[in-house]
Amino acid sequence: MARAIMFQGTGSDVGKSVLVAGLCRVARNRGLNVRPFKPQNMSNNAAVSDDGGEIGRAQWLQALACGVPSSVHMNPVLLKPQTDMGSQVIVQGQVRGEARGRYYQELKPQLMAAVMESFARVSEGADLVLVEGAGSPAEINLRAGDIANMGFATQADVPVVLVGDIDRGGVIASLVGTHTILSEQDRAMVRGFLINKFRGDISLFDDGLAAITRFTGWRSFGVVPWLKAVSRLPAEDSVVLERAVRGDKKSLVVAVPMLPRIANFDDLDPLKAEPDVEVVMVPPGSSIPGDAGLVVLPGTKSTIADMQAVRDNGWDRQLSAHVKRGGHVLGICGGFQMLGHHISDPAGIEGHVRDIDGLGLLDIETVMEPEKVVRNVQATALLHNVPLEGYEIHIGRTTGPDMGWPFARIGEHDDGAISPDGRIMGTYLHGVFNADEFRRRFLQNLGVQSSSVNYRAGVEAALDELAEGLEACLDIDALFNLK
């Protein structure tokens, strides 16, 4: 039976996903057969696993760190928020339905069987399984029926390490407070803690570590400094987008409106890695920069609602002005659907609003349909006749005259559309900029000099650098031998 360790946080965005990815690479480098697992994830940043279902992109990255194919069983329950009150529920890669907050709390006990089945599948043939929790175990109002944190840990008898984020302040209180609020049974599952995102001289926190141990009885497994490699890895939580600030002037400014239900925003990461490209996230209430050469409308979990948000923020008028100035626009997935004249949802799949006018930048229309397309694809970008690898996760069928100038060819059918002047493009494919040759040709078309950036190699190098950093600051031997 594989050994397992679960990393739970004192709150969201403490860095659990990246820590688990780095520790997966540490274990792999030590010759262990290691696998990632997250019982429940909430994210619109989904990936298509190697076995053809939807999982969180964090688990996809963790599988890459392990050097193994990704599987739906690595993230058996995925919640994709569609509104402020409800989410689409994905179980073992497939859509189970939709659930509002209270109904989902009632549904969770039924999902534990799927979680435990997937955990058993992931554990087969593994030496070590590194498990990631969700949110915080101190949310005791959600403890009944919990499958994400202590509910899973106690059911599967997996020891827990708590992760505290010192960068946001109050890490001593958050760890000691978690100890105080946990039940005696849950507290017994915790073997210790580690501190993440420390800046400066770590020895200055020695007294802090001693205080946490004095109040809780938990041992410290180490303090992780702010590691630069983390910034070169795909992020899962959209909260990182809110921190983006403009940097030095680059050859090309790419503006990205921050849609309320933005999805798969790691599509932008390869552009951020380009030395002559500045990616500017445009938050609600802000204007699209006038110096942008390209505007990317990203994916979204709720196209109609986010199309209304585009209009409410005045981005529709700003996009029209951008195009009149000679600017380029790329729409990805839901962003592609917004580029057309009209979006209709006769079955109410996305909500009570059944139709909305689009931006009218492409001569296309979209009808939402119940069947969801989820697949990895190999394609050819027709504008440059270069290969692409990407993935589709969408509902809706798009038709119209501009589909006669497709963005890509996938097997026997075409994808996307390009305007007659070539400045407006749309595609259902996520991950297109991961393809180095396509990205270079695309940027050259926008006047940016070709670079030698190999994006996938850069991610692998960042994982290796992260693993090296964790080896230096954590007691890995003690962690990997927890019982």
Curated annotation (Swiss-Prot):
Residues 251-438 form the GATase cobBQ-type domain. InterPro entries: Class_I_gatase-like (IPR029062), CobQ/CobB/MinD/ParA_Nub-bd_dom (IPR002586), CobQ_GATase1 (IPR033949), CobQ_N (IPR047045), CobQ_synth (IPR004459), GATase_3 (IPR011698), P-loop_NTPase (IPR027417). Pathway: Cofactor biosynthesis; adenosylcobalamin biosynthesis. The active site is at residues 333, 430. Belongs to the CobB/CobQ family. CobQ subfamily. Catalyzes amidations at positions B, D, E, and G on adenosylcobyrinic A,C-diamide. NH(2) groups are provided by glutamine, and one molecule of ATP is hydrogenolyzed for each amidation. HAMAP family: CobQ. This is Cobyric acid synthase. It comes from Brucella anthropi (strain ATCC 49188 / DSM 6882 / CCUG 24695 / JCM 21032 / LMG 3331 / NBRC 15819 / NCTC 12168 / Alc 37).
